[in-house]
Amino acid sequence: MGIQGLLQFIQEASEPVNVKKYKGQAVAVDTYCWLHKGAIACAEKLAKGEPTDRYVGFCMKFVNMLLSYGVKPILIFDGCTLPSKKEVERSRRERRQSNLLKGKQLLREGKVSEARDCFARSINITHAMAHKVIKAARALGVDCLVAPYEADAQLAYLNKAGIVQAVITEDSDLLAFGCKKVILKMDQFGNGLEVDQARLGMCKQLGDVFTEEKFRYMCILSGCDYLASLRGIGLAKACKVLRLANNPDIVKVIKKIGHYLRMNITVPEDYITGFIRANNTFLYQLVFDPIQRKLVPLNAYGDDVNPETLTYAGQYVGDSVALQIALGNRDVNTFEQIDDYSPDTMPAHSRSHSWNEKAGQKPPGTNSIWHKNYCPRLEVNSVSHAPQLKEKPSTLGLKQVISTKGLNLPRKSCVLKRPRNEALAEDDLLSQYSSVSKKIKENGCGDGTSPNSSKMSKSCPDSGTAHKTDAHTPSKMRNKFATFLQRRNEESGAVVVPGTRSRFFCSSQDFDNFIPKKESGQPLNETVATGKATTSLLGALDCPDTEGHKPVDANGTHNLSSQIPGNAAVSPEDEAQSSETSKLLGAMSPPSLGTLRSCFSWSGTLREFSRTPSPSASTTLQQFRRKSDPPACLPEASAVVTDRCDSKSEMLGETSQPLHELGCSSRSQESMDSSCGLNTSSLSQPSSRDSGSEESDCNNKSLDNQGEQNSKQHLPHFSKKDGLRRNKVPGLCRSSSMDSFSTTKIKPLVPARVSGLSKKSGSMQTRKHHDVENKPGLQTKISELWKNFGFKKDSEKLPSCKKPLSPVKDNIQLTPETEDEIFNKPECVRAQRAIFH
């Protein structure tokens, strides 16, 4: 169908266009193209003979689209079979029939997809199907016309006569018929390709020498529906022949086609005859004139043309019969009457197709083509209004000031602002966004004293040691602990971001000067104050009279300070600080015994140890010092305890215990714990590390003065530099952190004990200089290390009052609730069972 490859050959003359371009104008539509597309969707039903009208809806979709754009569509349908195409139509009919039979056979075999393809190729659009579309289009007021023979010639006639301004089709033969404007491949949105006859000269292959006649010759030579082409001749070679030939006689040119193309081609006489008939069919095919309502040739006959010899281009019938065929009232094959539509008695109803269209208003070209006063073009109305435009006076050279007050121009709506309420002052407005604590502070400052200063004056009697508070600190806090933490942060200059502080993951600088939680316990039947000042202080506040605890006098204080080397005398300023700390920690409730007897517990302090001696802890311990002197114990027991302390000091990384220890120990144990607890106090700063920071736990666990002397023997072998900072984070295991200036201690190997615990050697020395390792005399030799490494053959003889060493009891780390000798006392059998069983 059509001329193969014509659209690509003339693509320079085509341009994309939307059908809205023809708004207010009339376009003719080759409806059979829409019918073929719509029938493919229901090809299976049509092949089976089942009733369907999906193709009608498909065609009406395009019709409604054109009406929505303001374009008047005129639907054109094919009529009778043209005598020139009988051979072509017969071959097409046979091909459709074979596809139908093949599809039915495939459907029986169960090959549905292949059968559907065969059904799509076997579609035959009948006049009954076209009549359904005609009725549906008439219901919308759309004009329909059935061509006497082919719709292509009828479309070309309407376009050339000016009844329609463009033609919508899928067939390229319309260009050979001489159509002015053709819209090809239009989609459901109105987009397509427009080929204008006036732009055919833009094609480089055609050139300027081509005319409408030569273009038609080229289409016939390349092959069309009316004549098959010669073997090996297409559009390109046909165009070349017509460009080279200067002879106006086309018959002579066809005979010499082999000469022009330099090919061995023999042109038969039948081809020349067929060429002449095809050319006459393109020129003189019969069409119907809807305005005159009669059959007319596409082009007027020439002087040398006999109409009686052009029967292959269509046979004449009566005008009345042709009118009934054009209206669709008669069948094109049998000429039977199938409808009685009359455009004169049944005028088309005027219907609006857009919101902007007014009732009774008819745009140009919307009247029916069956009316005698049909105005096909817009130029008719524009010409009638032309004289009125000339009557208006010319404004050329005139100057006038134009005012726009009377014009209804689009402008922004006036937005009225609500009046400002002047009753509310700026101070009142700012006070709404200020906190209540700030107002309280302002009131306090107006009296001459700030709340923070008054509070601090109560807690700190000495102005020299009073802590400085920030002016922006609110006076009212949720609890005392929050106030204390905030004051410590302000003193240390730490930057606190709300919601981002973590008590577990932080640096040591962020938790300076923090006070630990109080800890107390009541193991078994009595409460004993332990080595830490915090535990002693809080235990005294909670139960001061338990088991005969009494404050000590000044002599006891002097004795305590004399027992601990490196401690200075207690000043009243330090006592003031201790009293302040005790008041702040007094509000905290001690945890129960079950809480203390757990694997994890809060550590003592987060406060940074200073290098200056602080006697505040000794002052605190004065009131808990026993007046009676502790009795001496066996030297063997003290040695064992000392060994245990040394072992534990190594296992814990030479760090002090975070929790206090409770137990049923002797008075000598309490005396030694309270005297040595000054080094690990969480409320005060530790003394200068004369006694060694790593030996603090050992001193706390000594049973008598002999244990204290054993611990003092190790003092010369350790560095006395004060660089060790210990920050105890609550809930985490304690780790020993040393100052960057301190050196690493060397722990030489000693003979191992039977229980598997190692004992510290008394000859272990600390390097006092960074270049000590390079001095030959002070270097440790491998031979000496091997001498020290070994096992003792003779086990120690234990006194009868003690039980033999146990690999289970001696290897476990003592809990904070128990002391060393709790396992050696017969009255503490219950505690042993509770711990080990």
From Swiss-Prot:
Source organism: Mus musculus
Region I-domain, residue ranges: 138-229
Keyword Membrane: no
Residues with the Phosphoserine modification: 589, 601, 614, 666, 737
Function according to Swiss-Prot or TrEMBL: 5'->3' double-stranded DNA exonuclease which may also possess a cryptic 3'->5' double-stranded DNA exonuclease activity. Functions in DNA mismatch repair (MMR) to excise mismatch-containing DNA tracts directed by strand breaks located either 5' or 3' to the mismatch. Also exhibits endonuclease activity against 5'-overhanging flap structures similar to those generated by displacement synthesis when DNA polymerase encounters the 5'-end of a downstream Okazaki fragment. Required for somatic hypermutation (SHM) and class switch recombination (CSR) of immunoglobulin genes.
Major location (coarse): nucleus
Lineage: Eukaryota, Metazoa, Chordata, Craniata, Vertebrata
Annotated protein name in UniProt: Exonuclease 1
Sequence ranges of Polar residues compositional bias: 449-462, 556-565, 611-623, 665-690, 699-713
Obligatory cofactor(s): Mg(2+)
Entry EC no(s): 3.1.-.-
